[in-house]
Amino acid sequence: ALSEALHADPETAWNEHRSAARLRDALAARGFAVTAAYLGLETAFLATAGSGPVRIGVCAEYDALPGLGHACGHNLIAAIAVGVASALAPLADELGITVEVYGTPAEEGGGGKIELLDRGAFAGLDLAVMAHPGPVDVAEARPFAVAHSHVRYDGKAAHAGAYPEE
């Protein structure tokens, strides 16, 4: 439902007010402490759960392409981020982790993550993750100082930006 709501109401870079609010509300409803307008960026946010010393960042993108809507799948990235963080949150204290969801606006040409990085958003994170849809049936992982992973997806591959007819 979250992915569909975002898809039905696309907002472009730095204008993702309703999208950011939907995501903040979804995370708050799941027990996350939410900070809007994170680090002075109006459509960025931070949502946290747990209080462990190991900090895990989950990035959520939610801006749309001008004239194309969510052809790059940022509605999926955002919904997956909420799902991953929501699955980890109930285990956070037991695992000794803090789950941090970073709402990263303006990823379609606006450099939202760069702005957040420059403002210190990701300082001290032990791990940062994000899922992104793509045009092929493989998971490509480029980990730094971690083991490679192999994931099998079943279904038909399609990417709205690369293969809109599929």
Where are these regions (language model features)?
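Histidine/acidic-residue-rich, glycine-tolerant segments that coordinate divalent metal ions
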Residues: 43-48, 63-71, 75-76, 95-166
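Acidic/His- and Gly-rich active-site-bordering loop/insert found
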Residues: 1-97
